[in-house]
Amino acid sequence: MATVGFDKKQFFFDRQIVIDAVGRAGAKNLSKAGSFIRRSARSSLRRRKKVAPPGEPPSVHSQDRVATLKNIWFVFDPGQRSVVIGPLKLNGSKLQGSNRATVPSLHELGGTAVAGGRRKRKRRAKYARRPFMGPAMERELPKFAGLWANSVK
């Protein structure tokens, strides 16, 4: 599996490259849409010790400010001229297993991965589907039409 790396900060909505690509009004509206979805996804993730039931957003157990599911970013995608929203990919966040998926994607889509490390016994862990990004977008979708209503003057 190939990984493409880039500096995501160059695609923040206040950068000139983004404003030139979609215009000031388009950048502002895409930024608001990304912000709405990010806020909705973050608020659906609860910090607690218990495991969330399948079908509900996952519980967040980490106290770290960086290595957590709540660290959600949104950036401009110049290829699609759209906004990309999701949890930050951390180094070492890929799990062993057949599809080598990341923890956020396992929560969103469900699946299996090999859990354990160098000194721990390795075992297959089955993740139930606990979506949080898809439902956040569905909740915020009705607001999007109003964003572009009077954007071109």
Regions of interest found by a model, annotated:
Residues M1-A21:
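N-terminal, Lys/Arg- and Ser/Thr-rich interaction peptides
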Residues Q10, R15, S40, R65, ...:
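Generic alpha-helical secondary structure signal
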Residues F11, L90-G92, P142:
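Generic "edge-of-domain/loop-turn" microfeature
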Residues R15, V22-A33, I37, M137, ...:
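N-terminal small/hydrophobic-rich alpha-helical segments that act as secretion/targeting modules
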Residues D20-R123:
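Short, low-complexity, charged/polar segments at coil/turn and helix-coil boundaries
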Residues A113-K153:
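Lipid-handling modules and contact-site tethers
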